[in-house]
């Protein structure tokens, strides 16, 4: 029997969702995806000056803290295939970003880059996290890099999984068209095409999570902040002296695999690899390899 405890969403995030009915439908889909969580978890709401942060927590209380930042519009439930591996040893904290579909609730409009750091610092302080491992997927990779550049004393190791707008900018071309069409004009057919372009193994994605992805775009106000996230400069990236893991799929339509080579040349302490037969959704496409590389990196293995 798998269970959750704690936070039930009562406040409305009208800065993200189109209306209360749309929000309720999305939250129901979020909870349906949570049924896929293979380990016990706690849902916790953290009050901050910017709004309420919703955090999914799994793993032994004595474990070293590992923070997970999800991809755009995916919410923390996107980690359902991976959380079982990560939480065996580590105390895992998966945080819903404040300005995207999820259970976090914003007090105001979108955050600027300084406010993003302040918000995360408030969340980490209230969770009692002074030093932790930090992993980010896709947009979460940019967030994790941005945070670490300003708080390197708090991050033990940094893990970047298919990090968009981090080493290179996204090139809008025919490869990215399906994903863009779904974002701009969401319907179920465009969702299918988008998923097929982002994943090499779309059949591995549970229907419950696909439904949540659909409602996370369909039932929310358009958010194109990812296009305003500037790639980091060579000097900024070179200042990351902590150990960094960079993983990119060989069929990632949002990242050129050459960023692995670029990371190897710029980052002082890096473990970078191209994951074969994986798209942008590499945590699903090649779950076993990605999880093994993550855990080996965390455990100090090369």
Whereabouts are the PLM-identified features?
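Active-site loop/oxyanion-hole signature of alpha/beta-hydrolase fold enzymes
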Residues: 49, 94-135
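Acidic catalytic loop of the alpha/beta-hydrolase fold
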Residues: 251-255
